[in-house]
């Protein structure tokens, strides 16, 4: 707790420090939303001029600014003026504004409901996607994250805008060697080589084929919900050749006996029981020599602050970051066994290869 006291030296106790931190988070959110930081000149701006520029009542602006000046988020070059320290200037950048707003709205709006959520649902991690802290915080306690976004277009737009800037994106290629798939390309021309399950608009399958061009695109299948599949860019030469199937991974797998079932950044979003449903649907479609490849962030046994925070972020939506033991549990419950794990050297990304257990 010493870190919170060093952040706010006048805090009498850690509790006071956490209170000051909450105040700072909320005031910064208001400043970001109303572009107050953007209106502050490099050499400082008077509170009166800033109120005129932003349309905020001067009394409110002064009260909010007083705290940010006291906490060193803002500076005061002279009485009645506000300045921007170098580190705060990042809030003039679109990327930082989008990300901060997203994590504040999605995380804090959910986290304040944790006590109520756990009181109602028991002291356990979310068991169902339609029983999540996010849904409770948004006013829809029986809806999943994606259901809530469907009902709240503004939040969906903010979410999509933040995701579009690629914060913390994980690599697709360079982790797992797909060259072995090439050897099977000519043995059975009718066999599907790779099924990209829940593959969105085809970013991953395209990257895999570009990395290993000897894999014929026509022997690959892109699967996602019909409304996602219809937006796949047909002008792309590779994706034009890939077969498209509109389906849900919660339904029976329609492509049977494929060599590889590839699923990237999907299981991360769902609780264990629903992941088992997804994997069992794949297992039921597997041939004896099929392989399942799961591309996800792999949680170390002793995660850093950032990784542990990311896991709790996912908990808000009933999702979960998993370590090797957790993936082993999913495998054994779904009729698979882990055969290898390929890890990215520069991140926590990994491709977990599983084989169907033969009865």
Swiss-Prot record:
Q: Where are the transmembrane segments?
A: none
Q: Name one GO molecular function term.
A: O-methyltransferase activity
Keyword annotations for this protein, in alphabetical order, are: Methyltransferase, S-adenosyl-L-methionine, Transferase
Q: What happens when the gene is disrupted?
A: Abolishes the production of equisetin and accumulates the intermediate trichosetin.
SUPFAM superfamilies with a match to the protein in the record: S-adenosyl-L-methionine-dependent methyltransferases, Winged helix' DNA-binding domain
Q: What class of enzyme is it?
A: transferase
Q: In which pathway does it act?
A: Mycotoxin biosynthesis
Q: What EC number(s) does this enzyme carry? A: 2.1.1.-
Q: Which reaction does it catalyse?
A: trichosetin + S-adenosyl-L-methionine = equisetin + S-adenosyl-L-homocysteine + H(+)
InterPro entries associated with the record: COMT-like (IPR016461), O_MeTrfase_dom (IPR001077), SAM-dependent_MTases_sf (IPR029063), WH-like_DNA-bd_sf (IPR036388), WH_DNA-bd_sf (IPR036390)
What Gene3D superfamilies does the record tag this protein with?
Answer: Vaccinia Virus protein VP39, Winged helix-like DNA-binding domain superfamily/Winged helix DNA-binding domain
In terms of superkingdom, the source organism counts as Eukaryota
> Where along this sequence does the record place binding of S-adenosyl-L-methionine?
198-199, 224, 248-249, 264-265
**Secretion signal, residue range per the UniProt entry:** none
An example GO BP is:
methylation
Q: What does this protein do?
A: Methyltransferase; part of the gene cluster that mediates the biosynthesis of equisetin, a trans-fused decalin-containing tetramic acid with antimicrobial activity. The PKS module of eqxS together with the enoylreductase eqxC catalyze the formation of the polyketide unit which is then conjugated to L-serine by the condensation domain of the eqxS NRPS module. Activity of the Dieckmann cyclase domain (RED) results in release of the Dieckmann product intermediate.
- Give the family this protein belongs to, as stated in its UniProt record: Belongs to the class I-like SAM-binding methyltransferase superfamily. Cation-independent O-methyltransferase family.
Q: What is this protein called?
A: Methyltransferase eqxD
| Species assigned in the record | Fusarium heterosporum
GN (gene name): eqxD
